[in-house]
Amino acid sequence: MARNVSSWSSLSCLPDEMVLNCLARVPRRYYENISCVSVRLRSLVRTPELYRMRSLLHKDSIYVCFCDRENYSTDATYLWFTLRPTTATMEYQLVPLSFPSHNFMFRASTVAVDSEIYFVGGRPNPTELWILDTRSGKLRQGPIKPEFLRIASSSAVGVFDGKIHVIQDLKQDETEEQVYDLETQTWKVVGVPVPDEKADSRPNMVSSVSLEGKVYAKDFGSISVYNLRQGTRKEKLELPIDDRWVSCMCVANNVLFAFFTKYGLLWLDTKLNNVWRVVTGDVQTLHRKLYGSAMAEYYGKLAIFWRERYISTSINTTKNNNNNNKKKEEKIWSALIALNRVGDGICGTIEWSGVVATIPYICQFLHCLVASD
């Protein structure tokens, strides 16, 4: 402890630019702990300049996975891409990657830690852990995890304090949690939950994100919050009463953002007792276009992806040709949204928007994660 204090004392003597240069090379998962050391470090970790430095170093990458929505068998196709800026113009594109394709990717809960993507549980083998190294494209199997009392299609998953937390609901106010220690590479069951006779009726989590020691898990019509600092205490997050459908959500600049069907892009004001507030600006022109969407943080901005279906190539040109004889493809669009604090609110400005890929029409968004070196 004394050595840590001494190290910070030496670092505190350096100018902001040099400290930021050091922080830009530190894995993002340590930023939350670093921000607790001092007010100055907390401010530096959240400054836009840090994101600019990380972008110059190409430290962070978005990985998007599409799957065949008409075939969930062992023969399903999984297409992986990464978002990259073009060299000739100030535009972006999704570049195809030769990552492995496995059936567990569809049902598994996913989370990115540094440069690796973890696939936890799912079907057909809910006790498996698979790890994809985004730098090499290699896939390896991790330690077998304990079985949950209830087998679900997916679980809430988040990273906190050097550990991956995997959570499932049991009774109304009771959860079951398993923790994977990233350093020791071992699993631990937290608590001894009591089986729930109505467990089969509990919802499956569609996606989840982590923010300040809490895991926010989205299913079809609600968002649950699991407080990891308080023994995985569960609470329901209130949603707008007339707009409960969340198409996608993510954390950017230590704020939870979600796209709602009616109100568009909202952010969660945790200082005002978890009140949803509208993100102002021209970003609100997008939400009517979001057909099958995904969202992730990209160097302090929001990167939003959505599908736009169109018919591109005719198989034959006979007089009786119809839509069934046409090959369908879909354009994948993306927009980069700059986020700025305006008083007590947040303004979202579209910095760039365009087509980033064309994929087979049978594919849908499956995963959208940010990995970093």
UniProtKB/Swiss-Prot annotation:
Superkingdom of the source species: Eukaryota
Keyword Repeat included in the entry's annotation: yes
Domain F-box: 8-54
TM segment ranges: none
Pfam families: F-box, Kelch_FKB95
First and last residues of every Kelch repeat: 116-162, 163-208
Gene3D superfamilies registered for this protein in UniProt: Kelch-type beta propeller
The keyword Repeat is annotated on this UniProt entry: yes
Keyword field: Kelch repeat, Repeat
UniProt xrefs under SUPFAM superfamilies: F-box domain, Kelch motif
InterPro entries for the chain: F-box-like_dom_sf (IPR036047), F-box/kelch-repeat_ARATH (IPR050354), F-box_dom (IPR001810), Kelch-typ_b-propeller (IPR015915)
PANTHER family per UniProt: F-BOX DOMAIN-CONTAINING PROTEIN (PTHR24414:SF143), F-BOX/KELCH-REPEAT PROTEIN SKIP4 (PTHR24414)
Name the UniProt record assigns to this protein: Putative F-box/kelch-repeat protein At2g41360
